[in-house]
């Protein structure tokens, strides 16, 4: 159906993989705004290149005539995770590894100054995503340190070993927009896999990710569901209590909510009324049921 709002052109991503284009488009819209939160100029370039392949980004905004709120939400989340990466590198100025799972078309490895002696950055995602990324995105310029772009099966118990991920330096594992499309058992197994791989070698590390709460789970699946439904997917997991994972993953310790709703109000561009309502939601302690970012250590 060439030229229709559902046209994908040459882009073959489907299901949860295609949803990465929703957040990519939001980051690009933020970069084009008068007062950007993230100001990810790379995303605008990537959107243009994907459009050249015939993809119609109307697929990502079917439910939003005015997407400014969602744009600010996505940009703020990305900015907070960028800050977490920067703080990890400040705490570990020597050799260190950063593993970005479900990297999609995110330019974090380009946005941040992570290179240094003994530094390793791994961007990882599914095979079809990595294939598209190689076609349309540049890799970080060669400097001190190492960059890898990989397509492991993160549900395979041996993937960290098979991809020769170092176990002799501090590690940060982060993923953004991944957990909503996993089952509870898959989330627990992934965290166990990561924790065991590094703890068995005596390596300390951090895991940071975002997760929807029960309120967001309901709203996305049953109210604002047109974009995901058109892509053939839905949310399959939510988390209201971040300490629950400690009981299922030995050695994993919950440390913090990385961003609460008033962080969105402080960093984002929502206007005074929306900002006030976000703060009120936190005062009544319902932020976790909406969704947040979480920091763990092992």
Curated annotation (Swiss-Prot):
One of its GO terms (molecular function) is methyltransferase activity. Its EC number is 2.1.1.-. Diterpenoid pyrones display various biological activities and FDDP E shows anti-HIV activity. FDDP D and FDDP E show also inhibitory activity of 42-mer-amyloid beta aggregation that is involved in the pathogenesis of Alzheimer's disease. GO terms for biological process: methylation; terpenoid biosynthetic process. The keyword Secreted does not apply. Pathway: Secondary metabolite biosynthesis; terpenoid biosynthesis. The keyword Hydrolase does not apply. It comes from the Eukaryota. InterPro entries: Ppm1/Ppm2/Tcmp (IPR007213), SAM-dependent_MTases_sf (IPR029063), TcmP-like (IPR016874). Gene3D superfamilies: Vaccinia Virus protein VP39. Pfam families: LCM. SUPFAM superfamilies: S-adenosyl-L-methionine-dependent methyltransferases. Keywords: Methyltransferase, S-adenosyl-L-methionine, Transferase. Belongs to the methyltransferase superfamily. PANTHER family: S-ADENOSYL-L-METHIONINE-DEPENDENT METHYLTRANSFERASE YKTD-RELATED, S-ADENOSYL-L-METHIONINE-DEPENDENT METHYLTRANSFERASES SUPERFAMILY PROTEIN. S-adenosyl-L-methionine-dependent methyltransferase; part of the gene cluster that mediates the biosynthesis of diterpenoid pyrones. The first step of the pathway is the synthesis of the alpha-pyrone moiety by the polyketide synthase dpfgA via condensation of one acetyl-CoA starter unit with 3 malonyl-CoA units and 2 methylations. The alpha-pyrone is then combined with geranylgeranyl pyrophosphate (GGPP) formed by the GGPP synthase dpfgD through the action of the prenyltransferase dpfgC to yield a linear alpha-pyrone diterpenoid. This is S-adenosyl-L-methionine-dependent methyltransferase dpfgK. The lineage of its organism: Eukaryota, Fungi, Dikarya, Ascomycota, Pezizomycotina.
């Amino acid at each position: 159906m060439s030229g229709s709002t559902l046209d994908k052109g040459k882009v073959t991503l489907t299901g949860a993989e295609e949803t990465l284009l929703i957040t990519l488009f939001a980051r690009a819209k933020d970069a084009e705004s008068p007062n950007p939160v993230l100001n990810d100029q790379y995303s605008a370039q990537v959107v243009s290149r994907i459009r050249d392949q015939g993809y119609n980004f109307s697929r990502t905004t079917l439910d939003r005539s005015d997407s400014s709120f969602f744009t600010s939400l996505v940009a703020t989340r990305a900015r907070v995770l960028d800050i977490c990466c920067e703080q990890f590198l400040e705490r570990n100025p020597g050799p260190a590894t950063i593993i970005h799972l479900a990297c999609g078309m995110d330019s974090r490895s380009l946005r941040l100054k992570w290179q240094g002696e003994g530094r390793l950055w791994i961007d990882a995602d599914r095979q079809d995503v990595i294939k598209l990324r190689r076609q349309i995105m540049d890799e970080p310029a060669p400097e001190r340190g190492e960059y890898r772009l990989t397509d492991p099966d993160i549900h395979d118990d041996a993937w960290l070993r098979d991809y020769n991920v170092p176990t002799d330096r501090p590690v940060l594992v982060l993923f953004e927009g991944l957990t909503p499309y996993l089952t509870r058992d898959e989330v627990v197994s992934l965290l166990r896999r990561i924790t065991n791989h590094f703890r068995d070698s005596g390596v300390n590390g951090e895991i940071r990710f975002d997760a929807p709460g029960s309120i967001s789970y309901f709203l996305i699946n049953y109210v604002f569901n047109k974009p995901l439904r058109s892509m053939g997917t839905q949310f399959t997991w939510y988390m209201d209590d971040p300490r629950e994972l400690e009981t299922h993953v030995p050695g994993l310790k919950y440390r913090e909510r990385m961003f609460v709703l008033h962080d969105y109000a402080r960093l984002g561009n929502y206007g005074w009324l929306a900002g006030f309502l976000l703060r009120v939601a936190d005062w009544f302690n319902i932020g976790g049921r909406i969704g947040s970012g979480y920091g763990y250590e092992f």
